Amino acid sequence: MTPPRSTSATSLQAAHASSSRTDEDCILVLQGGGALGAYQAGVFESLSKVYREPTWVAGISIGAINAALITGNPAHARITKLREFWDLVSSALPTPMIHADAPAREGLNEVSASQVMLFGVPGFFKPRFPPAPFQPRGTPEAISYYDTAPLRATLERLVDFDRINSSAVRLSVGAVNVRTGNFQYFDSAKQAIDARHIMASGALPPGFAPVEIDGEHYWDGGLVSNTPLQYVLDQPGKRRRVVFQVDLFAATGNLPATLADVTEREKDIRFSSRTRMNTTNELDRQVIAQAAKRLLAKLPAELRDDPDVLALSSVRSDSAVDVVHLIYRSKHYESQSKDYEFSRLSMQEHWDSGRADMAHTLHDPRWVNHERSASGVHVFDLTADCPSST
């Protein structure tokens, strides 16, 4: 299924061609969120057509899968491969032929989510048989409900890992070491990446078994941190960074009215990325680093080898960071099952919302006209009033 070409996206591409900059790092940061990940694919579609291709993609869980599909293909094929993946995983429940009102849509979504729990997702995972309680103790089959062998086959078919490991587009994915509880990033700038690293980033227990890599076992990175933003901000660099942070769970929300609402709200809070906290910390760090740099320049030469001075001089003082924050905002008929509800209808809605939100952001005068200063951290969250976000 080919996504319809948006006329607004076409006009934006022409209007903002001059805005694309090759003197900056364009970084796409993708949060985990299961079936909601189609939103990220839509964001990427608008980003690549309107602004530019990313130079670095970092992801957790479903964000790691989308990141691999992007970095593991040439620029002209990336949207096609993303579409192929999302069409595959949403193929079990095609779009209904009739328009459904909100109550009916809630019912359709719950049927879809129940089908996933019972039968799995094509090209992604399938139920184990016999079930885990009847499997030999200590085996992967005994500690997970689903088999992710289909995902490995899908990744190896749709992703060129040789391209990832030799490409100028950097890939970073996060997972947690089951034995130590420590977070671990797998980064193509530092090591070879294969399907295991992507699967490890998305191995959420108890649904999926941990993935073994070099004698250690890894679970979904979302258990510790559901976004790689801090990792990206912590890496040294001299060029301006424009970071597009794509979240699938909103930190803010309404007071729950039912137990089902409680479950959904708890999940949103648990997996939301705390982007503002990360960017505030980065701003504070930059202010301190730049003050230290100015102070050191005022010191006489005989003090510049002092250990305390050397320690201060090692504090990074990078160039500016712009963080463009896009957040998927749940539709009123979605529930706590939204991250494992893989119907074709929902997938297409998520994709369309991401595409519209990214286009809206790139067209917003607050983004188009903002001053690109040489230092500091600037945060843009421009989709709260976007029609696709309601």
Predicted regions and their residues:
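A general structural motif
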Residues: 23-25, 54, 168-170, 239-240
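C-terminal helical/tail subdomains of lipid-metabolizing enzymes
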Residues: 135, 142, 150, 155, ...
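Acidic, Ser/Thr-rich peripheral helices and adjacent loops at domain boundaries
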Residues: 257-299
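Active-site gating loop/helix substructures
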Residues: 132-238, 245, 252, 257-262
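Patatin-like phospholipase
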Residues: 10, 16, 21-29, 34-143, ...
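Small-residue-rich anion-binding loops in enzyme active sites
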Residues: 1-26, 169, 176-179
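Hydrophobic/aromatic beta-strand patches that form the interior of the parallel beta-sheet core
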Residues: 58, 174, 242-246, 322-326
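Short active-site oxyanion
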Residues: 53-56, 216, 321
